[in-house]
């Protein structure tokens, strides 16, 4: 109800200013109001973690972990922050975030703008939140793609003690050549190095933190099969499907559709859900799938689970529907078979 009142004001601002205003409000709420708790549902065990409900926040809304306690008040079963890089970087020039309200879509070309992993670590340590926290890691824009693994490993070392799980983002379309890491040989090398580091860190900290891989929706069937094989071979703990799409098939003629960047929201739902279904077949239940992409209502949340996902993440849907979407989706997925 409150969001219905606030939305016209937020939509009167340019998209990134509205994003910044929302983060500031969540930050204030987190610092001044009692700690939040997840919307009630039967817990589900995924990656060895007990998630209080199946609905989580996708990475991208809170890149630096500034508003974790405020976000915790919205009822999520888990929160994913980032994408974070080893060094601070400004991202791409503004404007770089565009709403497509006619189709409930968003285009972004943010470019991993963030304050660097050390700032995120400090913010996580300062937060009161004790729930399931994912931390999404990436590479700096000026790190050569052949050295990308070094950036992921640097971030993993620093966030490992604080994360419930760590997501390796190789699928943003807004960092030059990043999606090359989804190639067969590149992915094999990256996952091998990450798995070795995970095992070393587990011994060092006496605690196993799962690794997930976030992939794109713009993949051929053979690529999905290759990725599934690599995930199994390197014993990665889960996969997130999917990131944003570079396709504009669903938004032809819509204002801002020509803007460069990744498209999210309702227009990516079908492609993203198809990847979930293909992954589910290719993986044969050997590791869980976390679905993201176009979850705008309870029907689309359940469709992700029916396609083979174990957990569901929201982001664009929050912008168009507000916090009520979290509660609705938790309730709609609470009775889904475990």
UniProtKB/Swiss-Prot annotation:
Binding annotation for substrate: 63, 108-112, 169, 174, 243-244
Swiss-Prot/TrEMBL cofactor(s): FMN
EC id: 1.3.5.2
A GO MF label: dihydroorotate dehydrogenase (quinone) activity
Reaction equations catalysed: (S)-dihydroorotate + a quinone = orotate + a quinol
Keywords, sorted A to Z: Cell membrane, Flavoprotein, FMN, Membrane, Oxidoreductase, Pyrimidine biosynthesis
Active site per the UniProt annotation: 172 (nucleophile)
GO biological process terms held by the UniProt record: 'de novo' pyrimidine nucleobase biosynthetic process; 'de novo' UMP biosynthetic process
CDD domains in alphabetical order: DHOD_2_like (cd04738)
A Gene Ontology term for the protein's cellular component: plasma membrane
Free-text remark on how the cofactor is bound: Binds 1 FMN per subunit.
Keyword Cell membrane belongs to the record: yes
Subcellular locations according to the entry: Cell membrane
Binding site for FMN: 59-63, 83, 136, 169, 214, 242, 265, 294, 315-316
A Pfam family of this chain: DHO_dh
Topological relation to the membrane, as annotated: Peripheral membrane protein
UniProt pathway annotation: Pyrimidine metabolism; UMP biosynthesis via de novo pathway; orotate from (S)-dihydroorotate (quinone route): step 1/1
Subunit text: Monomer.
Protein family membership: Belongs to the dihydroorotate dehydrogenase family. Type 2 subfamily.
Function of the molecule: Catalyzes the conversion of dihydroorotate to orotate with quinone as electron acceptor.
Protein name, as recorded: Dihydroorotate dehydrogenase (quinone)
Organism: Azoarcus sp. (strain BH72)
Gene behind this protein: pyrD
